[in-house]
């Protein structure tokens, strides 16, 4: 008996040791907070959720958040026409400027109210200060309100306990890329302190665009103004900083993000603009009080946050010599427009959780927000009908901010309240029910419910049945844009709406093998689209699909991860497949720690063909498969972490789709967006 007990104890100790070692290598992915507002096991969360840790990010060689998100099942990172900004396509929903995805940093929305997305000056997000990324696919408005439509992304930054000391790092590589950063985590008396500063610069990939909108105009007008064939303008200068202070139940955070000389990609009007640039500045701060035992059976959380966003531009919409709009008018220096906008956001909210009722966990919350574009400015050398001022030179640029603004300053207030109950119906069964009401001062109220039934069918099997609705608030430009012949706002817009039904199962058939699969069906209505140059609620879209993911540790030093996604979305008006989203998506990665302190990570990303919009004469855009490779040494005992990554190892000609302009006699970018070719990066960091 003693021998049996000894062997059993040894086996348990070995299992615990293996689990601890895996957690150290890959990070703790067993819990998620984004699904309910409190920390719960991922397998029992009332949502389809993915957690990516800092260890995952380092192993895959990612340098920007977009590279991290591309690995999430059901999520593909496409590109938009203006500034090559990322478009997070979740479950086939790829509309407008991508306002259907809510981006949070430490729970604070990064939404800019003018466009409803992350802003034209987003300029990427570096990963050095990211502790983990939590993603839910599906509606989240019952907890998070507006824009938690197709999904929610929450980026959680590092605290003093994550850093524990000082780290300095350097990176260099292709496209004249250079980055330097410093992280520090420690104590200042009784206060936990963490700080982060990063400076970066890149010229970006400069793959050639063979033809652009000016090429089509040249063919129509008999001019030779186009700069195509020519390179994409994808450079930027970056500055990021953050400070995190916590004491007992209080936490104060402030973050600064500046992007300068952001390239305009293929041009904001789909005409190459090699000298065009965008500047943005984002300043956020928040003060949070959290007490998990404020009274018997009660926990409370209160938060005040502010965000200030500035976006300035210097743009040549069409190049010198163009006759893009009037055959008799040649623009000496091109069609120049420089819109600028300033936003501020203020939020206050709180929640309370009560556990005094047996088998129930009740969460109540309320809050208010003020969001406004408080200042706009524009200088340009053309009138509202696109006729030129003077000869169309830079000397003819005038300030039209007071006489013909693209939008006058606007603001709105919203109030919200919500309730959620996590009810343990019987052993192994949990029902989560929630309801949230949001009232906006401009378009009124909307109420969104959620229901989630989770059954732990066996010690290694969990099933979920989920239902929820969500809404996407109209942006300020969609409501109030003026003095633009191709875009006019509509103050009578209603929010976009979606309802989603999901079924999910997670299964761990072996101690080192985890499998997950989910099926979904969604229905969208009141889609906001441009109809005859005016924004209107027009259109419906339905979709269904599945997502499969697996993690397998065949040996102690090897981990295989992968996922497959399928979606079929249909535009109800046309009966055709919804445009510009891949039907199939596969991601595979191997992490092999082949000797102590060293690892190699190859990964493959396959994106299937993407259907075109109705009326687009081009064939569907072909798919692509890229391979990345990262070699990394983490000599923790000596403080060094060195990595080399090769992205797009085989230099595949990968492309993302460009839009089709209905009624235009030519396609602005007929050969789509070329993605970066092969690139190599080397980085080294030292911790002490």
Question: Where are these predicted regions, by residue range?
Answer:
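Periplasmic-side early beta-strands and strand-to-turn transitions of outer-membrane beta-barrels
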Residues: 142, 154, 162-163, 169-171, ...
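Gram-negative outer-membrane beta-barrel transporters
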Residues: 424-430, 515-524, 537-614, 685-687
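Short acidic/polar hinge/loop motifs at secondary-structure boundaries
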Residues: 109-137
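N-terminal Sec signal peptide and the immediately downstream disordered periplasmic leader
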Residues: 1-62, 66-70, 185, 291, ...
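Conserved C-terminal beta-signal and adjacent last beta-strands/turns
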Residues: 185, 191, 239-241, 246, ...
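Extracytoplasmic beta-strand/coil segments of soluble accessory domains associated
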Residues: 34, 49, 66, 70-109, ...
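N-terminal periplasmic accessory domains that precede
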Residues: 65-68, 87-92, 101-106, 120-123, ...
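Membrane-embedded beta-barrel scaffold of Gram-negative outer-membrane proteins
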Residues: 301-305, 374, 456, 460-464, ...
């Amino acid at each position: 008996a003693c021998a049996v007990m000894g062997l059993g104890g040894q086996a348990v100790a070995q299992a615990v040791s293996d689990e601890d070692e895996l957690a150290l290598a890959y990070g703790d992915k067993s819990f998620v907070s984004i699904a309910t507002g409190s920390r719960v096991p991922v397998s029992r969360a009332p949502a389809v959720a993915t957690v990516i840790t800092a260890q995952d990010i380092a192993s895959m060689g990612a340098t920007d958040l977009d590279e991290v998100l591309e690995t999430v099942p059901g999520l593909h990172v496409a590109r938009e026409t203006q500034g090559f900004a990322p478009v997070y396509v979740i479950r086939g929903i790829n509309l407008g400027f991508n306002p259907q995805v809510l981006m949070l940093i430490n729970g604070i929305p990064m939404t800019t109210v003018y466009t409803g997305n992350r802003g034209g000056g987003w300029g990427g997000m570096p990963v050095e200060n990211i502790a983990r990324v939590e993603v839910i696919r599906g509606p989240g408005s019952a907890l998070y309100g507006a824009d938690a439509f197709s999904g929610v992304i929450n980026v959680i930054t590092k605290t003093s306990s994550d850093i524990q000391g000082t780290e300095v790092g350097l990176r260099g590589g292709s496209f004249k890329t250079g980055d330097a950063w410093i992280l520090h985590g420690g104590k200042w008396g009784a206060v936990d302190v963490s700080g982060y500063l990063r400076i970066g610069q890149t010229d970006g990939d400069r793959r050639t665009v063979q033809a652009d909108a000016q090429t089509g105009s040249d063919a129509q007008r008999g001019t030779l103004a186009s700069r195509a064939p020519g390179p994409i303008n994808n450079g930027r200068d970056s500055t990021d900083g953050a400070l995190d202070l916590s004491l007992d139940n209080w936490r104060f955070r402030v973050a600064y993000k500046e992007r300068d000389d952001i390239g305009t990609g293929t041009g904001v009007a789909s005409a190459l603009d090699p000298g065009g640039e965008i500047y943005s500045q984002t300043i956020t701060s928040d003060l949070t009080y959290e007490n998990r035992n404020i009274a018997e059976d009660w926990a409370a959380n209160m938060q005040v946050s502010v965000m200030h966003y500035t976006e300035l531009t210097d743009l040549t919409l069409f190049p010198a010599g163009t006759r893009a709009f009037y055959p008799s008018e040649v623009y000496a220096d091109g069609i120049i427009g420089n819109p600028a906008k300033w936003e501020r956001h203020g939020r206050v909210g709180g929640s309370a959780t009560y556990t005094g009722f047996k088998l129930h966990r009740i969460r109540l919350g309320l809050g208010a927000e003020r969001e406004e574009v408080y200042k706009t400015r524009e200088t340009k050398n053309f009138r509202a009908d696109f006729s030129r001022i003077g000869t169309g030179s830079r000397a003819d640029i005038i300030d039209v901010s007071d006489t013909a603004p693209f939008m006058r300053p606007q603001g709105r207030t919203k109030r919200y309240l919500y309730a959620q109950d996590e009810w343990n119906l019987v052993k192994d069964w949990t029902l989560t029910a929630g309801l949230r009401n949001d009232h906006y001062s401009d378009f009124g109220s909307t109420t969104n419910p959620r229901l989630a039934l989770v059954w732990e069918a066996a010690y290694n099997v969990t099933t979920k049945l989920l239902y929820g609705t969500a809404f996407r608030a109209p942006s300020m430009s969609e409501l109030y844009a003026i003095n633009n012949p191709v875009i006019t706002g509509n103050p009578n817009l209603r929010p976009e709406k979606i309802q989603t039904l999901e079924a999910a199962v997670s299964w761990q058939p072996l101690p080192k093998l985890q499998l997950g699969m989910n099926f979904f069906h969604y229905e969208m209505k009141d889609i906001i689209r441009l109809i005859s140059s005016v924004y209107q609620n027009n259109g419906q879209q339905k979709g269904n699909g599945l997502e499969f993911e697996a993690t397998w540790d065949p040996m102690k030093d090897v981990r295989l991860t992968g996922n497959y996604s399928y979606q079929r979305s249909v535009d109800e008006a046309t009966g055709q497949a919804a445009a510009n989203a891949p039907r199939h998506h596969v991601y595979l990665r191997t992490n092999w720690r082949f000797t102590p302190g060293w690892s190699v990570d190859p990964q493959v990303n396959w994106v299937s063909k993407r259907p075109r919009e109705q009326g687009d004469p081009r064939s569907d855009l072909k798919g692509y498969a890229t391979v990345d490779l990262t070699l990394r040494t983490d000599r923790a005992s000596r403080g060094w972490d060195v990595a080399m990554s090769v992205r797009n190892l085989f230099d595949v000609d990968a492309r993302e789709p460009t839009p089709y302009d209905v009624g235009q006699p030519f396609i602005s970018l007929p050969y789509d967006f070329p993605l970066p070719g092969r690139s190599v990066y080397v980085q080294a960091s030292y911790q002490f």
